[in-house]
Each structure stands twice: as structure tokens, then as C-alpha cells.
Amino acid sequence: MESEQRITWFKVDAYTVQQRKSWYSQVADAYNRARPRYPMKLVYRAVELAELDKNAIILEVGCGPGTPTTSFASLAFSMICLEPSLEACELARQNCAKYPDVEVKNITFEEWELEPTKFKAVLSATAFHWIPPEIGYPKAADALEDNGSLILMLNMQAQPDYEVYQVLHQVYQIHAPSLGQYETRETQEKNFRSFGKFAIDSGRFQDLISEELVCEVSYTINDYLTLLSTYSPYIALEQQNRDSLFAALREALEKNCGESIEVSYLSGFHIARKI
């Protein structure tokens, strides 16, 4: 499988509906604990550009355990959030328990019954590529009120310093060669920019605005390995292969990095207006 951050729509036809529903179920708790949050600076900027006022209703597609949800909910928006994984859905409900105007539904976007022109914004954070584009964009547009906005937020895969990567590369070559490619900042920026183009190419959206920033995070080795376990290429590994890889990664990290590892990632959004 190609890297999670390369925009390939995950070859969704290769997976059954049930497989797509449960893909992250086994790592829902790890996802909740380890995935980076979306910077509030970007959240505020998205709210500004989408012209969301206090009465705006947001439809979130693929909310996961509520990683982006709580950021928008904290700004007092009403939200209907769709999440196909039962495990992630339950975590999202726990994380959003203090926000009475947030409803989390255990359902796919495809199965969800369309509520036409109800929403000021359709929000999806590192999730919309799981939906076939010929379904996702038209349905999102139909759910939006006139001049409503599609907000696609993305966190690209966290990358260690190149010196650390060189150490880990040797491990990947032994245990999982397909996962050993280093994504440069330029590569991540290119992949990020390409994602926004799909919305325009759908013929249902216009006036694309894209912004991004570089984020830096320090992880303990345990937390970094937990983070890796939530990325799709690692989920796809056979259990024995994954266990061997993670044991070797841990050994290399503890030997060369001490107790923590510094990583960086590109975080950003694409906002497009309904035609």
C-alpha cells in the first residue's frame, strides 16, 4: 500500500464497505492518544475564511475519535459528526461529552441520509480520501447551503529528522522496505497541494483557498511507535511482521535517540465554496 499521505484515494474499490468501516477500529485508542491535533491557528483561520457565524451548523465526515471535532466544538458550533468505526465513534462521544450541540453518529458518509442544504460547512480532517470522489464531492455539495464551504484539513505524516531517518532506514530495509521512504518537506507540500485540486475538478466547488504551516512535536519513543501504529501502511502489515518491525525500531531509537524523538509535519487546510 502506498503511503497514507499520498493522495491515491486508498484504492477504495479494493476494500469492502466493512473493511473501510473497521480499518482504524483496532487502533482507535492509539489514534486518540497519539495523533497530532490540528493547530488552533488553522482552525480559527478556517472559521474566518468559511465565514462561520455562531449559528452555523457543521457536518463532519469521518470524525475519528474527535481529533478535530473538539477544536470546532469549543467555538460553540452545532455539529453532526459521522464516523464509521464504532470504537472511534465511542471515543468521539466521550471526548465531546461536554459539548451538547455535538452529535456523533456511527455511520459512513455514503450510508448517511442526505439532509439537503442544511449545513454551512462540511468538514473532513485527513479522512475524505476514504470516500470515492464521485460520491463524496457531489454529496458534500448537496448537503451545503448556498455559498457553503467544504473544509478539508490535513495533517501529513510526522517525519523524524533526516539523521534519525537514516538510522531507521536500515531497520525498514530488513523488515518493511516499502515503508522506508523519507518524505521531504517539498514532497509533503506537493502532495498537500494536489489534494485541494480534487475538489475543484469535481465541478461542484470553486474559489479554492489553501494554507499550511509546519508543526514540530516531541514524542517519547513509546508514543512515537504508538503514532506509527495508527498510519495505514503499518495497519496493513501482517501482525508478525509489524511486531518484528516495531521491536527493531524501538531498539534503534533507544540506542540512538535516548528517551524522545523530535518530529515535524505539515498541517493545513483546503477550503472551497459550493458552486
Can you describe what each PLM-predicted range is?
Residues 120-134:
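A short SAM/SAH-binding and catalytic strip from SAM-dependent methyltransferases
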Residues 3, 65, 188-275:
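Conserved Class I S-adenosyl-L-methionine
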Residues 145-215:
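Conserved catalytic/acceptor-binding region of the Class I
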Residues 135-146:
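A short glycine-rich, Lys/Arg-flanked "PGG" loop and its adjoining helix->strand segment in the class I
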Residues 2-53:
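Conserved class I S-adenosyl-L-methionine
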Residues 112-122:
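A short acidic, Gly/Pro-enriched loop at the edge of an enzyme's catalytic core
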